[in-house]
Amino acid sequence: MAIKKEFCIMKNNYPMWANYRFTGSHKHHIFGAAYRKKSDEDGLVIFLTPEMHNMSNQGIHFNRWFSDYAKKEGQKAWMEYYGKSKEEFVARYGHNYLED
């Protein structure tokens, strides 16, 4: 079975995450809940091992530092890829994750 190619603007950050789907990987939306669809549309997804997703205490769903780091990297990637400002990011995603 072929691995499905998915749109992702995130930089590869091994061993934390990949920017491509790999066998057994879990897809994680950088900005979930109300922003999940926008994350998909904008390529703000990463691919994780099950342990780094939600199958251990180190997983992004249980590790605040990891989640915050991914959000910061996601905001930087979005601003760079789309040539947009912090204000435009906040208008789309509701929050600035970068230090001023």
Feature names for model-found ranges:
Residues 13-14, 26-29, 53, 61, ...:
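Histidine (H) residue identity feature
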Residues 46-50:
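Cysteine-rich micro-motifs
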Residues 23-36:
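Short recognition patches in nucleic-acid-associated and regulatory proteins
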Residues 36-44, 54-100:
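Polybasic, low-complexity binding patches
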Residues 1-26, 51:
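Short cysteine-rich loop/turn motifs with clustered Cys
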